């Protein structure tokens, strides 16, 4: 060791401490640290912007991306933390923070190999997912990994490796029962909020269904977003366990129970990129089901020209992949292919979808028949798969339980255990788009509809979204309402409307049909 | 239009103005705007973190990524701009800034199509590159595009479309001459700094060679980084033109002449990701050569097990692609495959490489013979391809011009015109790694060597890098120096040394050879 190395060693011990300071900057989920260019740490360590640094305070370490600052608002002796860095480091204001180079990320070489078209195995996916779950990947690294696995770039063996790696970094709930049912919808269909109906129906029939749901990734509302309008969903595992023990079921946000820490991190980049991947979808869904302690899982696969799954062929291929990987990790996977040609129910967006759900549960005149029928079909499958109804007898039982109010009572009990049933918020800014001509509705573009609902503010603004007034095959007159945009802020209403006006018509009205 | 829409229109006119404020936050090149969560714009427009927003001041507009802030250091009525947002918006402190939703980025659907494995055509690449050049892509979008095109995912037609799209968004210099020569090295070989020798040799023989070079993307030094140690390289087009008119050549940074605005933006994400793509490499190189007004281009393709091009087969494939695309856009492309088994010269890193270049130009005893020979070979090719020497006579002419001092005089003239020859900086913190045993050097891992040089601070710290003391085939004794790490900061020296110690040996010493 040379004289310089001894000096370097000393620097490492003493010279690299700053004081923790909360900047209040929301960088979404990527941890960022702000340090003055002329602070002692940047000078001695040679740090520049975009460097990945390790922050250590009170024995806890995180990796963050550095932004160097020239500006008096940041003191020379502080490490300014973004909100996510502040939360994950858990430091006290003014507490000493040691700042060092982040350890080299060797698993990135596997990501690079995947980008270049090579196949990865258990060890490589294990290394990548373990680094992802530990927060060692920057958003750029995550974007590269997700893109490299997107489309159909993961084969069966790779999808299984990824699934196992994602299960390995999380916890797994043991319910002490031989049969725990679950469902998942592959999505892409606005308003398809059947979970909020299926869970109360099947738990009212004695099955156990501890449902963890996701927030929206690329859609205007995830099931967790919609449920949150009606009851708290940010439960931890002990609270979730209490709700399930008392009611047989729950509908909580999977991110708060943190059963799939890697998945929660990947989702933060999938959302702004609006990318899906078959392999990642399978790994994400099945690792969460395994972690939640499920044994029997029904997968709803809506198929339609503008849904996520666009053909019966694609549904069969995805379904087979789900069953193969499920079998390899000890999950029995059942499939139900459903019609995905148009939105389900009337509302798109958290509050508008929740309103439809309540109407079905309460059997009111406004209850959308399609949402009710889809939920009954899926509940019937689960009742039969779980042995609560004889083969072919599921639909009759599900229909009775919904009609006689047992499902509504069960839903209220679940909401109450999760923290209390809430009343629905309403949007203040509305605009109705009318039919330009007279004719029949021959096509509805789900993707444009979902994008317009997102531009109107959904799901961040829970009352925002779209109310759909016409369905496929309906006859409409010129000037008749097709759909209404709901927004909580005037700027968002204007933005969504501008989008709708600039695109091809979302509803195709044909005169001679 | 409803009452709400009129209200939205009014808000858009008046309510969305904040005052420009320079935060001094360096976010590398991504423009970021910091706004208080409770500011009037966030409240009226419903903006949340990660939103892409359009900022307009004095008729100039940019798109930036929003970070929402809860914190008193940022005033309620300001739009806090990152350094890159501040520079590109060009606002005055306190100037009103209008903040609106960024227009929807329709070209992202093409990126998504490419991610899912579809081929893109002229129109799609044109739309993507035009949005990239206009700064409408976030770093996450750029990472997705780059990953989707990485490896060999672009076919010939797509590579040509991308090249044409990149040329279309930039300027093209017209030198008014039928023959303008250029060279490019595909890279991956530390220390291969032949450009600084080739330009003075061939311009001393009367050819015109206006060389724009890049900064390091994934290497410890780019040609522009090395040249910058010796003379200013941040010239604009008129200054570059003046240098070339007076001396016949130049060596400037391509990013400052801004001939390839899209390429300059893509590189900002390629660097942290350490990703290369054949299609993007071809498009990047050839679009820059076309923009610089070159007509005849020599491509140096170093081949070696740990170089960027690893086999003669890969070199032939890449070379063919460069010639095909070059031909289609009117560039004559010549190839020279060179040995890429070990670093060139002794130094790795801007200042250490510049020192080697000066030794060759001045013919001193320390001049690395391999660097000298490689440069003479390439200069000879260019002299013949440009008609300054008869076929087979290039090497003799190049050798004479270097030996008699004309090349050194020309290099000084070019440096002087670019702003003056500078003296070399030296690193303060050194550590020499010695051979663990006695034997012959049978393998040198260029990739690990380059990574260690980067961890030591190169190229951001110009004096940082590695001095290599042994070459392939050399016999070394135990304890004999193999290489010396140079760093400007003690932390960086420690970090690089830690890396070297944790990896397999960079130099393989075999006893029985």
Curated annotation (Swiss-Prot), chains A, B:
Pfam family membership, one: PYNP_C
Highest taxon, organism lineage: Bacteria
One BP annotation, GO: pyrimidine nucleoside metabolic process
Keyword set includes Ribosomal protein: no
GO cellular component: cytosol
Keywords carried by this UniProt record: Glycosyltransferase, Transferase
Keyword Transferase (UniProt): yes
InterPro entries, per the entry: Glycosyl_Trfase_fam3, Glycosyl_Trfase_fam3_N_dom, Glycosyl_Trfase_fam3_N_dom_sf, Nuc_phospho_transferase, PYNP-like_C_sf, PYNP_C, Pyrmidine_PPase_CS, Thym_Pase_Put
SMART domains reported in the protein's UniProt record: PYNP_C
Reactions catalysed: thymidine + phosphate = 2-deoxy-alpha-D-ribose 1-phosphate + thymine
Molecular-function GO term, any one: 1,4-alpha-oligoglucan phosphorylase activity
Enzyme Commission number(s) from the entry: 2.4.2.4
HAMAP family according to UniProt: Thymid_phosp_2
Family: Belongs to the thymidine/pyrimidine-nucleoside phosphorylase family. Type 2 subfamily.
Protein name: Putative thymidine phosphorylase 2
């Amino acid at each position: 060791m040379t004289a310089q190395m001894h000096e370097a060693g000393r620097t490492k011990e003493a010279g690299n401490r700053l004081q923790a300071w909360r900047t209040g900057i929301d960088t979404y989920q990527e941890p960022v640290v702000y340090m003055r260019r002329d602070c002692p740490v940047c000078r001695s360590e040679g740090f520049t912007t975009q460097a990945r640094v390790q922050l250590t305070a009170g024995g806890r370490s995180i990796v963050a991306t550095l932004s160097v600052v020239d500006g008096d608002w940041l003191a020379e002796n502080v490490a300014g933390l973004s909100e996510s860095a502040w939360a994950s480091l858990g430091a006290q204001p003014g507490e000493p923070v040691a700042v060092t180079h982040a350890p080299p990320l060797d698993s990135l070489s596997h990501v690079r190999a995947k980008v270049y078209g090579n196949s990865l195995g258990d060890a490589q996916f294990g290394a990548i997912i373990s680094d992802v779950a530990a927060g060692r990947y920057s958003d750029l690294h995550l974007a590269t990994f997700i893109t490299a696995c997107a489309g159909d770039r993961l084969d069966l063996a790779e999808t299984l490796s990824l699934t196992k790696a994602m299960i390995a970094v999380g916890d797994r709930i043991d319910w002490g029962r031989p049969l725990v049912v679950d469902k998942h919808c592959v999505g892409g269909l606005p308003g398809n909020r059947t979970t909020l109906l299926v869970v109360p129906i099947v738990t009212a029939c004695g099955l156990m269904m501890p449902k963890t749901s996701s927030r929206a990734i690329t859609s205007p509302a995830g099931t967790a977003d919609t449920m949150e309008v009606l009851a708290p969903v940010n439960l931890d595992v002990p609270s979730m366990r209490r709700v399930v023990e008392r009611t047989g079921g729950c509908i909580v946000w999977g991110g708060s129970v943190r059963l799939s820490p890697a998945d929660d991190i990947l989702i933060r980049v999938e959302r702004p990129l609006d990318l899906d991947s078959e392999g990642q979808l399978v790994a994400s869904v099945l690792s969460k089901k395994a972690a939640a302690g499920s044994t029997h899982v029904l997968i709803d696969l809506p198929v339609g020209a503008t849904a996520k799954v666009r053909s019966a062929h694609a549904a069969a291929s995805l379904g087979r992949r789900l069953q193969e990987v499920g079998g390899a990790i000890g999950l029995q996977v059942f499939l139900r292919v459903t019609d995905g040609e148009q939105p389900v129910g009337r509302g798109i967006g958290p509050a508008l979808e929740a309103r439809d759900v309540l109407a079905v549960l309460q059997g009111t005149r406004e209850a959308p028949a399609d949402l009710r029928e889809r939920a009954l079909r899926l509940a019937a499958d689960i009742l039969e798969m779980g042995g609560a109804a004889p083969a072919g007898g599921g639909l009759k039982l599900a229909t009775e339980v919904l009609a006689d109010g047992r499902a509504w009572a069960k839903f209220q009990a679940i909401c109450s255990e999760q923290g209390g049933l809430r009343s629905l918020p309403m949007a203040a800014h509305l605009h109705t788009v009318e039919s330009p001509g007279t004719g029949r509705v021959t096509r509805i573009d789900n993707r444009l509809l979902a994008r317009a609902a997102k531009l109107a503010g959904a799901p961040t603004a829970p009352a925002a979204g779209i109310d759909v007034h016409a369905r496929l095959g309906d006859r409409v007159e010129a000037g008749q309402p097709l759909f209404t945009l709901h927004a909580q802020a005037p700027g968002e209403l204007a933005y969504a409307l501008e989008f709708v006006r600039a695109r091809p018509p979302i509803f195709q009205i044909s005169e001679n049909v």
